[in-house]
Amino acid sequence: MSDTRAVVVDPEAPGRLVIRAVPGPVPDRGEAVVRVRALSLNRGEVRRSGMAAAGWRPGWDLAGEVERAAADGSGPRTGARVVGMLPEGAWAERLAVPTHALAELPDTVTLSQAATFPVAGLTALLALGKRGPLLGRRVLVTGATGGVGDFAVQLARLAGAHVTASARRADQAPALRTLGAHEVVVGDAIPPSPKYDLVVESVGGRTLGTALGALARGGMCVTLGVSASAEVTFDAREFFIAGRTTLYGFYLFTELGSEPASVGLRRLADLVAAGQLTPHVSLERPWTEIARVAQDLMARRFPGKAVLTL
């Protein structure tokens, strides 16, 4: 198959990310060839690209059209608009994607919206599900202005939870309340009261340490990121004295071993189509600006998600 273009790591280039010609996709029987039209960035893949060797291809999130359906007859048809994900290498013009990692999109969901679903949306959806039904429960979402946090606040409110959002600055509170947060906590420390049935925690450091002391009896803290610090000190007595508390380590690609990505992606797409969930694209640029947008993401120059179009 003819060459395509993809984002690759070049340690000598500004921002370490460049677009170069690479071999075109050669799909297995259970893979569809997708023409990518939009992609989104996540801190994890950008952070790794800053350390990866030359030639590594980053990228998790993608949206586009099926150029060639899977040979085994599974998955979306040729011409279908889809959202999908890969464990790496998704930032490319054309890709072979396993059909279990693809979901067809309703007509009213744009490709830019869909590109935000895979890592941020699925992480929020699956993390919230770890505690069981949330109706009437107290849920705390830390890092709430980020991509995962944005989805988590909305999905928790939709599930009937009483939602508290944690933010770094007071001026972020109005936007979080608009998303659906009932209350907003400002700063890197979580007060010991009220107590929470579920904490979705993506910050690490002091935020994680104090969140563990704010769990209700039987409460669970799902830790899924360390945007502030990977080192945590916490009061073990505060954590265990509540009784039956749990600290759950969440890694999306491990969780997807239990349920294919296509299931959650379709659920997110249906919620957006129904007007119950709103993806927030803070920045939309051509993919030729990948290096600059990646740097802006890591410097926290915008909230929510950045989408690049091809």
PLM feature spans:
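N-terminal Rossmann-fold cofactor-binding loop
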Residues: 166-170, 187, 202, 225, ...
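NAD(P)H dinucleotide-binding glycine-rich loop of Rossmann-like/cofactor-binding domains
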Residues: 47, 81-143
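C-terminal hydrophobic helical "lid"/dimerization subdomain
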Residues: 2, 259-310
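Mid-domain Rossmann-like dinucleotide-binding core that forms the NAD(H)/NADP(H) cofactor-binding site
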Residues: 115-186
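Glycine-rich beta-strand-centered segment in the early N-terminal region that forms part
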Residues: 23-40, 48-89
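Glycine-rich phosphate-binding loop and adjacent beta-alpha segment
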Residues: 206-277, 310
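A short acidic, Gly/Pro-enriched loop at the edge of an enzyme's catalytic core
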Residues: 191-199
